[in-house]
Amino acid sequence: MSEPEIKAVLSKINWDTPLSTDDLYLVFTEAKQQIGGIDKKWLYTRILNSFNWYTVMKIIPREEWPYLLSDKIIDNLFPRQLRNKYKHVRSALFE
């Protein structure tokens, strides 16, 4: 996805933070490790909670999927059914 497309997606998950979409993009691209308590773990959790898997696949580069689908991220998802869904996705892709 292009930078404007990614920023459009990030703007949809940024409804409750004082940060700008540009700040989130810096964390997303790892130009900054953390801004105001927002890190990549927070972004990935929010993306998985907000979008379907097909949208997630377009946003997150494939080489990031092992981290995206790690327990560190999945354990923060809500509701439990969503956690189970992404555990099944992980097992289908990596096991």
What are these regions (language model features)?
Residues 1-95:
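Long, compositionally biased intrinsically disordered regulatory segments in eukaryotic proteins
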